[in-house]
Amino acid sequence: MYKRQNLTNAVERLREGVQAYQENPAKIIRDGVIQRFEFSCELAWKTTREFLLDQGFTELNSPKATMRKAFSYGLIDDEQAWIALLNARNQTSHIYDDATAQEIYSQIESEFVSLFDNLIEQLKRG
C-alpha cells in the first residue's frame, strides 16, 4: 500500500509537469517531465511486482516480465502499450537530441499518464 501511494503521488507530480509544459513549453520543463516519467515508471513496475508477489507469482525479475504477468493476471489491459512505455523509459537514458525528447514527451502526455492512472485504479481494486 505504501508503494501504491508513492506511485499515486509520483503520477500526480508527472501530471503537474505535463500541465506546466502545456502552459510554458520550455525545454527545461519538458526535461523535468521526462525525469518524473522515469521515476513514475520505476514505481509502477515495482509496485506491480510487489502486488503480484503478494498474489503468489514468482519469476518477476524485470519490468517487462512483471508487466506481462500483470496483463495475464488482468491487472492491465494493454500489454503492448506497457511494453512501449517501458521501451520509452529505457530510451530516456540515451536522449541526445530534441526530437527524441519531444517524441517521448508527446507519448507521456497522450498515452502514458493514462496507463499509470488505469494501473493505480486496478491496484486499488486488487
Residue ranges of model-derived segments:
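Solvent-exposed interaction patches of small proteins and small membrane subunits
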Residues: 3-126
